UniProtKB/Swiss-Prot annotation:
Protein name as catalogued: Putative pre-16S rRNA nuclease
Gene Ontology molecular-function annotations: nuclease activity
UniProt keyword terms in alphabetical order: Cytoplasm, Hydrolase, Nuclease, Ribosome biogenesis
The organism's taxonomic lineage, starting at the top: Bacteria, Pseudomonadati, Planctomycetota, Planctomycetia, Pirellulales
Subcellular location, record wording: Cytoplasm
């Protein structure tokens, strides 16, 4: 693990390599950033398998990529309200934190897939390759948004799992 400085009550580091997750029940997109939180890159798309195999994947990923913390996309409506998918993402984020033992924050993922599709289309890839990469690029867009929000605010963005309830609006996040 890299040396990290903790700044949040949930143990989320102020530096160190982050990984973002675009959670889905079939595929999970993953992106990572450098330890200084400057550049985010799509890493891969993980096909969802059994809970045991998925756990081993994320444990191995955290170790091999020296991940200090996770950012999990939270799908919410344009008005800030949550959906059934939001509950699934919250459950996954709690599972990821428990499984890997790493701090995990939720961050608004509105429009990340739209932005990812636009980004991929600029590269003139085939439809098949677009479908294969869109979740990883959506995770990259999510991580870029998280990093930018942290820089803009001068503090951590998103919500830690403990203070985030499904009744609140995330427009202020």
């Amino acid at each position: 693990m890299p040396t990290t400085t903790t700044t949040a009550e949930d143990g989320f580091p102020a530096t160190g390599r982050l990984a973002s997750v675009d959670y889905g029940t079939v595929r999970i997109g993953v992106a990572i950033c450098d330890p200084d939180w400057i550049l985010a890159s799509p890493l891969e798309v993980h096909p969802v398998s059994t809970p045991e195999k998925d756990a081993q994947y994320f444990i191995d990923l955290a170790k091999s990529e020296r991940i200090a913390a996770w950012v999990v996309g939270l799908p919410i409506h344009c008005d800030g309200g949550e959906s059934d998918k939001s509950k699934e993402s919250r459950k996954f984020a709690a599972w990821l934190k428990e499984t890997t033992g790493l701090p995990t924050r939720l961050f608004d993922e509105r429009f990340t897939t739209v932005a990812a599709n636009a980004k991929i289309r600029q590269g003139k890839t085939t439809r098949k390759k677009t479908k294969q990469r869109v979740d990883a690029v959506a995770a990259q867009v999510l991580l870029e948004s998280f990093l930018e929000a942290c820089r803009y605010r001068g503090e951590l963005a998103g919500h830690c799992l403990e203070d985030s309830t499904s009744d609140e609006s995330l427009d202020d996040a």
